[in-house]
Amino acid sequence: IAREHGLEVDEASFKSSMEEHRLASGAGKAMGSLGGEGVDIYRGLLAELEANGSLPNTGVAYDPYSRRQVDGVLLGLIANGKPVTQANLGDNVEVIIPDSCFYIESGGQVSDHGVISAQNEEWEIQIQDVRKPAAGMIVHIGTVTFGAPQVGDKAVATVDAQRRQDIMRNH
């Protein structure tokens, strides 16, 4: 467009000035966390789970419409941004299971709440949020309310059906 109007642009100086401005303005840090900062952790864990056969190459199965409960295995736990093999009472964790019946926030409808618990009832995690931090990866975010869940434990994921119904009715 500049050439069409007989103007010249010093692109090198422009790029240099833009970089100086970007750094002086905090390089976008004033906005805080924009999401996606920890995506490599999720991608790495997903690749590992696909490679060892725990997940298909399509990742975590997602069907929040036909079921409100699924059985599975605790494939992964993330605490403080790092994969762990076990969590303890009071820990805030992200839980990975092979199949999710929890609705992920979309189109103005909030994520489901519910419980992921051991099939043998030795532990329980109250789920307060569900996210998809990378393609194929779904994490259930919650707090261990009793016991000590471990990767490899058999688990049951149960959506709070009353809460979902109330949200759907008002959405």
Give short role names for the model-derived ranges.
Residues 1-171:
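A glycine- and charged-residue-rich anion-binding loop/surface
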